Amino acid sequence: MLKSLVVLLLTSRVIAFPTLDTDQTAALHKPQATPNSQGTHGGFFYYWWSDGQSPAAYTNLDGGSYCLRWESGGNLIGGKGWSPGTDNRTIQISGTFQGVENSYLAVYGWLETPKVEYYIVEYHGVFNPAYDAQILGTVICDGSVYDISRSTRVSSGGTKILPRYWSVRRNKRTGGTVQTGCHFDAWRSTGLSAADHGFQIVATEGYFSSGFAEMTVADTSAEE
């Protein structure tokens, strides 16, 4: 009888474990990404932004180098360059770029008056980021034909429509020299009038894609 009572007490005992509420559970499964930031490092301007939906690690390396590893899940962009930018800069790009799907390597920047965003796309995956842009023509720069086009985007605050200029290289590459003046001349011939450069970087961008990039940038304008 005593043995039966011990078994009954053991089997009827309730053990309570702490539980996570909804917010704690969401935080536990939230993708981890390097916090957004911009500034100077190693004598170069750097810019890093993600929407926080993709596991991603951005790291500034020595000089004009940076490293980015990311997994699919959202939108992100990062890289090194200069602030302010300029119409006429000779940029040397080297390193390793292993982006697939919707990812690209580009010279990326802003003009401030009025606000205009631009991309000189050196490499993209299966998805052309300028697929829905208005074709303006072509230009030959640095040994390849580039398709130049214009599109628009909504500002981050959702209050303005901003123009965006594209120059997409047909003969894709992940390194070499980019003469930005060739592209700005082409864009300005189609109506680009904005001046006063913001930053200008060699960027790795991903959108629901995955990949790895370790890139180095340099301004070789003075060597010409």
Swiss-Prot record:
A biological-process GO annotation: xylan catabolic process
List the keywords (alphabetical).
Answer: Carbohydrate metabolism, Glycoprotein, Glycosidase, Hydrolase, Polysaccharide degradation, Signal, Xylan degradation
Per UniProt, the enzyme's principal EC class comes to: hydrolase
Q: Does the keyword Coiled coil apply?
A: no
GH11 domain location:
32-218
Entry's Gene Ontology molecular function annotations:
endo-1,4-beta-xylanase activity
- Family classification: Belongs to the glycosyl hydrolase 11 (cellulase G) family.
**Protein name per Swiss-Prot or TrEMBL:** Ethylene-inducing xylanase 5
